[in-house]
Amino acid sequence: LGPERGGARFVFTPPPDAECRHEEVDGMEVTTCTLRPDTSAEDLGYLAQAVAAGRLCTPSATSYCVGAVVVLPDGRTFTGHTHETSPTHHAEQEAIRKALDAGADLRGAAIYSSMEPCSQRSSEPESCTQLILHHGFSRVVFALYEPDRFVRCRGARTLREAGVEVRVYPSLAGGVREANAHLQ
């Protein structure tokens, strides 16, 4: 029953690539959508590299072990992991620094991170989310939303609101959890 008959109205906004059909059933508007799993082999490959890079991080009680891969539109890649060159650097920051040191223009690039990019920091002036927005990345792909252990992360939400395409592949999250078993 619709709201006019004492029923509830449920609103679902399908993704742009979903195939949907609309019909009326017993006086109700019904939308049926076919959703396809998001399994780009390219995304999974780069994300697996990021997860592997996260395993190179020295475990710390004050931070997650994260890996990141910057992929430029021309196909060049730059990989980093948490604490690679400094005890305060995050993986995204390390990979971005390497790309900038190589003279790369990051506008339109993608970044693959084993964990959701941080949205606030106490050890650096800019969060990874701010760095991603500042440098004009068009896509962010990660495996695991950042747990609320240290801060309440809003990275994915902030990036989406700014128009950045955000993809999450939880099928690779197990490797991220393993790399961060020291925080369990």
What name fits each language-model region?
Residues T77-H83:
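A short, conserved beta-strand element enriched in hydrophobic/aromatic residues
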Residues C65-L72:
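Short beta-strand scaffold segments in enzyme catalytic cores
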Residues S86-R97:
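A short, polar/charged loop-to-alpha-helix boundary motif
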Residues D105-A109:
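Short helix-loop-beta connector
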Residues P59-C65:
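Short, flexible loop/turn motifs enriched in small residues
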Residues H89, S113-Q130:
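Local cysteine-cluster metal-coordination motifs and their immediate loop/turn environment
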